[in-house]
Amino acid sequence: MKKVEILKTPVIQQRPVAPSRTSSPPVTAPRIAIKPRPPPASGNSGIPENNGPISPPDSSVSKSSGMKESVRFLNDIGEITDSISDLLTNSPNFNVISAIGPQGAGKSTILSMLAGNNSRQMYREYVFRPVSREANEQSRHQTTQIDIYVTNHQIFLDCQPMHSFSIMEGLPKLRGGRLDEATAMSDTLRLTAFLLFISHTVLVISETHFDKTIIDTIRTSEQIRPWLHQFRPKLSIERMTNLVFIKTKASSIDTAPSVIRERAQLLRLAFRDSKWLKISKEPFKCLLVLEEIRVKREHLYEGEDEIDETMLNEFDEHIAQLRVMLQRNRDDFTVETAAMDEKKWLEMCQEVIRDKTFHRILKEFHRSDRDRSSIYAENGDR
């Protein structure tokens, strides 16, 4: 019996063994130590899940949908991917932010930052994969049609580049047609008009302050609208889409306040008579100027390729301000406030794609554009 009691005593000593509970934390302790370590090292940015000073204190960029990267929203034939509905909820508190612009302007990078990435992460960690260095050198594009990334209350849409020769080369294979400028222009108008209708805010991202070709395309796309009079809840015909222009890869001259004010005034004049598009009249909210950051790649920072912490901190701060601004300025899609949720929004997108009026107006613009191209070609041959 005494031996049995003696055998029990070690067992009793093992029960309160606080060391055994404290001995398991050392296994997880390195993980806990690793997470807080990056924020001080990277200044104001932090790891993607800890947005710190870069994002508002709410969960506006929390990855509640479980998405690790963007997926295709529109497939090659221009229809919405079947699995998108699984990413959306019945919440009426959502914000749709799209990005359009020419090839290589940084659309995917800006959207990735708004979605929760930061300027110190590897490019392969971005939710919208930026164009690779090899593809950029060969003038190839990264995004085809439209990609989507969903976070808590935020829906980000990344559009293929506008007026891209790389896109135009692939159109005959997708559409079974021929390579011509009119077909490429029609494809650009279709996607731009679609995004202008279904988005709260459209970011126009370019390497120039005032890109007349892009602005003309937007003004034309504004007129290509669907007629969804039977859609419920009833849509507001007076709703205006918010436009924000972003100049990327800016030099020190581009960031001068006088230059920004002057170019912003030109943009306001270009859209002063717009019925469905609005531009902020507040200073420095119509046009945002961002300096170039180098996308971090493997084995990049060697020798002269040292990262500029000050530049990265300023870039992250601009993104933080933009993120807050995009939350405030949005009009309801419907006549009644908060009558549309995320899933209803997806139904509206599907109705736009199927709408006959939308495609009829698009065909008219396509026909007139092809006629103009034929006239120019004939005049050039003479």
Curated annotation (Swiss-Prot):
Q: Which SUPFAM superfamilies match?
A: P-loop containing nucleoside triphosphate hydrolases (SSF52540)
Name the residues that span the membrane.
Answer: none
Q: Which UniProt keywords apply?
A: Nonsense-mediated mRNA decay
Q: Which InterPro entries match?
A: P-loop_NTPase, SMG9
Region Disordered, annotated ranges:
1-66
GO BP, sorted A to Z = nuclear-transcribed mRNA catabolic process, nonsense-mediated decay
Record family assignment: Belongs to the SMG9 family.
Give the protein's function: Involved in nonsense-mediated decay (NMD) of mRNAs containing premature stop codons. Probable component of kinase complex containing smg-1 and recruited to stalled ribosomes.
- Name of the protein in question: Nonsense-mediated mRNA decay factor SMG9
